[in-house]
């Protein structure tokens, strides 16, 4: 594959026969070898491996959300890509705008909720993995308090914090979670500073919804355990990582490209999780056998549908009742989640 630098971005792809389906990807960060963008790029490679000379792929990396995103999506559409994946929440409105201007192009937006005749939305139930992490954290923490590095206070991230909290409380009802927001999906410096600040505040477990390995490396340096994010980060902190929520986008990308090729593509809005294989857990490491066994059992129960992390009784942070015993949160509520559950030690930014 030819890689060329264009206007500060990396443009991957080689010119091949015109009849190939050209598939474009817009990335929030660099593909690198870890994290959110890495997993999307691995899925792109899986797409090429699965469909071979039927497809040609292109990507633009380090595309900022907002006006830059709209320009980049438009650029990649003008380049002849007929299927375009925009892989960050903040690309939603720019994707909607560009989709209107290119009705013959199919657009797929990750983690959002807006759709159009030629635009789908796809998301993963990351919160399912967060619940498993919470269970592990409560078993492994000696202090009963974990630190959580938040990226941007959108519902997806708030879901994860709350699910982590609920998983921990299923083991230790008095468990608490401290949160620091860095207001960025990828900023190694801020992520490292947040991890240090949380450890200084007394946490002995670190988890994150940010894209770099900075936090887990700080945890390693400070001698506490941590969780990876989006991909398996074990090689960066082999004695520190307990597990990671791993995003497996490959099967979805292959399915959608096949649909374009055979003419069956339709706009949809999907939210898949462990059951569908979009969310997986990295190997459970650096923990006693009994904790590993409980983690495996929890993962299996979520995957089978036996366990729904958002099942009452659950109280909000302010002490009010959210869900009665046995009551389950519906997807619409989760997709608009803008509050903490009880036990989270933070004021949610508005």
From Swiss-Prot:
Q: Which Pfam families match?
A: Bmp (PF02608)
Record-annotated disulphide pairs: none
Q: Which UniProt keywords apply?
A: Signal
Query: What start and end residues bound the annotated signal peptide?
Result: 1-17
Instruction: Answer yes or no on keyword Glycosyltransferase.
Output: no
Q: What cellular component terms from Gene Ontology apply here? A: plasma membrane
Q: Where does adenine bind?
A: 36, 185, 211
**Entry keyword Signal:** yes
Q: Which family does it belong to?
A: Belongs to the BMP lipoprotein family.
User: Which PANTHER family does the record associate with it?
Assistant: ABC TRANSPORTER SUBSTRATE-BINDING PROTEIN
Its biological purpose = Binds adenine and probably also other purines, such as guanine. May play a role in adenine and guanine uptake. May be part of an ABC-type uptake system for adenine and similar ligands.
Q: What is this protein called?
A: Purine-binding protein BAB2_0673
